Amino acid sequence: MESIGIVAPQTMHFAEPLRLQSGSVIGNYQLVVETYGELNAARSNAVLVCHALNASHHVAGVYADDPRSTGWWDNMVGPGKPLDTNRFFVIGVNNLGSCFGSTGPMSIDPSTGKPYGARFPVVTVEDWVHAQARVADAFGIERFAAVMGGSLGGMQALAWSLMYPERVAHCIDIASTPKLSAQNIAFNEVARSAILSDPDFHGGDYYAHGVKPKRGLRVARMIGHITYLSDDDMAEKFGRALRRADGALDAYNFSFDVEFEVESYLRYQGDKFADYFDANTYLLITRALDYFDPAKAFDGNLTAALAHTQAKYLIASFSTDWRFAPARSREIVKALLDNKRTVSYAEIDAPHGHDAFLLDDARYHNLIRAYYERIANEVGA
């Protein structure tokens, strides 16, 4: 299937202040957006794709000045793909607090003339959804045919169906969870601690020092990658294979240099991430993950939290995902069924762990394709 081709982001400016869940207010902010496909005359074929931790508005296609800059879900979104841009108008939004052009810690604080840094307020999934709703308003979209996301993106999709029930026809929630477990919060805390303890962090104001806390970011990403892969996947990819510069395959160096293939992989991923991502953004987004818990206001009762939803749902999980295990998706399914909502659920037997939602698995893509075929028939796309 062909790619959507060359795409270009656009920056949307919002003068009306946005009050955050914390009570802080962000004024005169901007959000970077990409769109794919055409909005029909009835404005009924719009789909919002919500991004996960380190992704962005750049969902599909490539940039003219960088043909290697393929969108993070290019295998899912495009002409003839499961989310077919010949039929749907797809929007990707870079969330507040991110580091890819939307207002965030790297932006200039108008009150000081300097980057916000650590002074940028903590944001939540709910704050992002409110900001995304303003994007929908700007496009004249009263109701999305679907809101879709994987992992943290799935949390946003679920939040949309809770916060704007009349504006979401279908919620597609993949490899996600209704709240983080204590173990997941612990992983995030270790990652944040690595960043906060980096001497180059400078209390979050490292921009003024001309440095980045790369060591902390590197470790944070390495921790994350361990949780994104399954044990079986890591065993198949790396096993206990050694990586030796001299070509020796069965001898140890008896040092603390990189010796195992899995060590090399983690360091490579950490180095790559530290080059392009912002540490303050990492702190913000992991805290937003921690805080997401729509049942909290209902004494932990997820069924009560979902009582006012109106959307139809597709919930999908992956058998080897231990970051957000299938049992967490089934919690959502049960709560929706308790409310007599229309729910489709699939647990896909895939070996790749949490990252499976990003990969080109035929069974998974066929599931999404079939569901969008149903939506297309409903909206005449």
From Swiss-Prot:
It is an enzyme of class 2 (transferase). The keyword Amino-acid biosynthesis applies. Its EC number is 2.3.1.46. One of its GO terms (molecular function) is homoserine O-acetyltransferase activity. GO terms for biological process: homoserine metabolic process; methionine biosynthetic process. The active site is at S151 (nucleophile), D321, H354. It comes from the Bacteria. Keywords: Acyltransferase, Amino-acid biosynthesis, Cytoplasm, Methionine biosynthesis, Transferase. It catalyses: L-homoserine + succinyl-CoA = O-succinyl-L-homoserine + CoA. It is found in: Cytoplasm. Residues 45-360 form the AB hydrolase-1 domain. SUPFAM superfamilies: alpha/beta-Hydrolases (SSF53474). Homodimer. Transfers a succinyl group from succinyl-CoA to L-homoserine, forming succinyl-L-homoserine. This is Homoserine O-succinyltransferase. The gene is metXS.
